[in-house]
Amino acid sequence: MKTSRFDERYFSRYYGKQPVRSMNEVDHLAAATHEMVSWWGGSIRSMLEVGAGPGHWSRWYRRMHPRVRVLSTDVSEHACKRYGHELRDIAEWRPSRPYDLVVCMDVLQYLDDRAAERALRNLTAATRTCLYFDALTSFDAKHTVDRSSTDLNAHLRSGSWYRARLERGFVQAGAGLWVRKSSGLVLHELERTR
């Protein structure tokens, strides 16, 4: 991945005065994710944010759940310096231990297919309990996003491409949540998307 692409100009464009996703929006998403894992009987004691950008998830966990061990990573040297992340590329790096919650939001569309497959394997290995995953898909690019404020310079794939790979290690719970099959969490049939 070309990390120089994600420089100060990129962050100003997509996370500046009119961000693609605001801190407030991510606060709601993080709270909902945390509560859903609790609802299923899970406990989040560690959280990994991959491609953290401005680090909204990490900031929420540090503020709302200060006992949770948080690691935030990004491929952007700019983001790492500005927001305090570790410089890591999930397509090349696999954490030495799993995390209860792994968050990877709007990252994999920047990777080609081979790198995205490696990243998905590394995300699976990094996840003990639950993965929050989202990536811009070809459908989203055509039908759901504001094309004027979304970075469309990406490798657009179908949702089924991602699902086929994630379903090897996860159960899709919906709303971006994927529960690790080996986690021991029990989802009722209608809590699953399939």
Task: Give the label of every model feature segment.
Residues 1-97, 111-194:
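Class I (Rossmann-like) S-adenosyl-L-methionine-dependent methyltransferase catalytic domain
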Residues 103:
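A conserved beta-strand element that flanks and buttresses the S-adenosyl-L-methionine
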Residues 107:
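Hydrophobic adenine-recognition pocket in adenosine-nucleotide-binding enzymes
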